[in-house]
Amino acid sequence: MSSVINVLFVVLVFVPSIYSAPPPNLTKDYYQKTCPDFNKIVRETVTPKQGQQPTTAAGTLRLFFHDCFMEGCDASVLIATNSFNKAERDDDLNESLPGDAFDIVTRIKTALELSCPGVVSCADILAQATRDLVTMVGGPFYEVKLGRKDGFESKAHKVKGNLPLANQSVPDMLSIFKKNGFTLKELVALSGGHTIGFSHCKEFSNRIFPKVDPELNAKFAGVLKDLCKNFETNKTMAAFLDPVTPGKFDNMYFKNLKRGLGLLASDHILFKDPSTRPFVELYANNQTAFFEDFARAMEKLGRVGVKGEKDGEVRRRCDHFNKLNV
């Protein structure tokens, strides 16, 4: 196992709004007439990208979560900072969002603009790409309804308090999830997305330096200490969130929590806290139950704060508003 944990990633990796019901035009076949090749183009773009960069799936899942929890699934996290506005993606909590996730959205948008210009929103691209990538690495299939519009605002100063942190308690995390309409069980199910991906050393350094958290598996802690010994000077150093099957979407994340192999304090607390432990036990013992609950939670996540025609647009470029906003 230690050989798996020792793999390093030099990279860039789990955001907020009030939950609202989907607008009437959010449908599975939204682009059937206006962009009939939408599904095909997304699928044919994500497949080679995931093959070339195996961390793309985890990064895109994280990017989607950060987008939806930050005032809805409206692609606001994709906006680039300019001289007038510091955008969400440049807030400290988003600084480690991986470049490969932004890149796959850009690639898909470019391909779609050639096939059906001005039709498909960046928000829908991110939602569809996330689902396709999750299933590519073994995760459950879930329905993605389409018709989201891209938002008009992206403010870095609004991010704080809307994203769960690496060292938060269950009550603190739950307060964030509840703002978006999610239950305690759904919090645990969505946390299972940590079965793929990684986290930078600074996010869990307090568990290994200066003293090791006694609830952390001793051998695992030793590997992490060696891995992260220079993390203050080399900020790219990272470890897998699931050190056993890091590239496979399965229920190993929950099994790991029972063995002291939860990387983040906010991972470990799910097993330690009596309110969430039964769900960890359920998912560790029953992958089917985890997949079913994760799929339902992802469908629900995709409906958070959706923008319609009146409060959104279809961006020409995913990192810029069509008109300058300040």
Swiss-Prot record:
Domain of life: Eukaryota
Cofactor: heme b; Ca(2+)
Residue sites binding Ca(2+) 2 per the record: 195, 242, 245, 250
Key words of the record: Calcium, Disulfide bond, Glycoprotein, Heme, Hydrogen peroxide, Iron, Metal-binding, Oxidoreductase, Peroxidase, Secreted, Signal
Comment on bound cofactor: Binds 1 heme b (iron(II)-protoporphyrin IX) group per subunit. Binds 2 calcium ions per subunit.
Gene3D superfamilies (UniProt xref): 1.10.520.10, Peroxidase, domain 2
Catalytic activity, reaction form: 2 a phenolic donor + H2O2 = 2 a phenolic radical donor + 2 H2O
Subcellular location, record wording: Secreted
Full protein name: Peroxidase 41
The organism of origin for this protein: Arabidopsis thaliana
Gene name, Swiss-Prot/TrEMBL: PER41
